[in-house]
Structure formats: structure tokens, C-alpha cells
Amino acid sequence: MARGCLCCVKYMMFLFNLLFWLSGCGLLGVGIWLSVSQGSFATFSPSFPSLSAANLVITLGSVVMVTGFLGCLGAIKENKCLLLSFFIVLLIILLAELILLILFFVYTEKVSENAKQDLKDGLRLYNTDNNVGLRNAWNIIQAEWQCCGVTGLSDWHEALQEKSVPDRCCQEHYTECGRNTTNVFWSQGCYEKVEEWLNDNKHLLGTIAMCVLVLQLLGMAFSMTLYQQIHRAGKKYDA
């Protein structure tokens, strides 16, 4: 009976972590594809040049892959050391998420102001030759979200030191339209647009966050249950 319970928990954990590992492979693949095919779509932040969408997805995919591999191997080999390592990794990730969440809510205003200032500093690099990625990123965001600058089109005037804006700020887009001051430009800043999107989708984002939390807790529960089952089975065998 005990052996049957052990096998049941073992294969449940293996399947759980196999899906986890496959998800990591998928994320890593998407990250590599973004890095290779969309390399020109880089970061908005001059302070964190490596903080691009591709690098974030690659990092996330790698962490998920390694964690899933630990869980799969620990389950199939019934290895207590690997199972404990899997539990500790998930616990560290969970604690890091909670700490970051608490810090974010405590320092929301400061984080927001620093983010705005950093993005504004990045606007100054818009026309420089070695920042094609930043330029493409701003062009895509402004066209898709129908916004201009960080808090408004005046950000571009300050950054470019002239009364012009990128062409993607124009409501009717054509070449050099940003230099024609009689044109109608998008008046809303992109930062505000992103805040609106986050507010509109807060329930969906909250649901996703809860699902991630449940998956982490399930992984920790499976690993500790299997760890205890193996430990007890070992004691009975020794006796």
C-alpha cells in the first residue's frame, strides 16, 4: 500500500515537472527567437541595457527549465537530495517574488518616478547610431498604443532639443510629419497608456499571478510529500 502511494505521488510529480520543464523549453525557444530575429527591438532603459524582452524571456525560461529538470530527475530517481533542492529553489523563488511585490507596493511612487526619469533619459539616445533597438522600440510602442513620449510630446522637445517629435507621434503618419508643427500629435504619454492597460487588465493579471502561485505551492507540496514517502520507505527497509 505504501509503495503504491509512493508510486502515485512519484509519477504525479514527474508529470507535473515534465510540463514545467516543457514550458521552460518553450520560453527559452521564444527568447532565443526574439534575440535572433527581433534583435533590433531592444530596451527602453539606458541604465539597464541588458533588460530587453528577449533576455528576460531567456532568463525566465532557463530558470523554469532547470527547476523542472530538478523535479523530474528527483521524482524518477526517488532522490531525496534532488527533491530537497527542488523544494529550496521553489521556496527561494517564492520568497523573492513576495519581497519584490512588497517593495514595489511600499515604494510605488518612487519606483514610478525613477522609471519615468530613466525612460526620459533614454529618449536622448533616440537618434544616435548605436541605439537602433531603442528607436525601433519607441516607434512600435507609439504607433501601437497611440501615444507620444513618456508623459507627453514635450518629453521629445526636451530630449531632441528642438520642436519636433518622431513621426510615429503623428495621428496621420507620413515621412517627416513630426517636424510639421501644424500636425495633430498623440497627446497622451506612453507611461500613462501602460498604466491604463495594467488597470484595465488587473483582474486577468491577478488571476495569472494566482495560478503561478498555486503551481509553485503544488510543486513544493509534491516534492515534500514524495520526500517524506521515500524517507519513510527507507526507514522501513532498514528496519
Swiss-Prot record:
Cytoplasmic topological domain ranges are 1-13, 77-85, 225-239
In this UniProt entry, which residues form the Extracellular topological domain(s)? 35-55, 107-203
- Where is it mostly found? membrane
Give Gene Ontology CC terms.
plasma membrane
User: Transmembrane stretches, by residue range?
Assistant: 14-34, 56-76, 86-106, 204-224
Tell me the leader sequence span: none
Q: Which UniProt keywords apply?
A: Glycoprotein, Membrane, Transmembrane, Transmembrane helix
Quick check: keyword Ubl conjugation in the entry? Answer: no
The species is Danio rerio (Zebrafish)
Report the sequence similarity comment from the record: Belongs to the tetraspanin (TM4SF) family.
Q: Glycosylated where? A: 180
Q: Report the gene name.
A: tspan9
Q: Its topology with respect to the membrane?
A: Multi-pass membrane protein
PANTHER family hit by this protein: TETRASPANIN, TETRASPANIN-9
Q: What is this protein called?
A: Tetraspanin-9
Q: Which InterPro entries match?
A: Tetraspanin/Peripherin, Tetraspanin_animals, Tetraspanin_CS, Tetraspanin_EC2_sf
Compartments where located: Membrane
Question: Pfam families recorded for this chain?
Answer: Tetraspanin
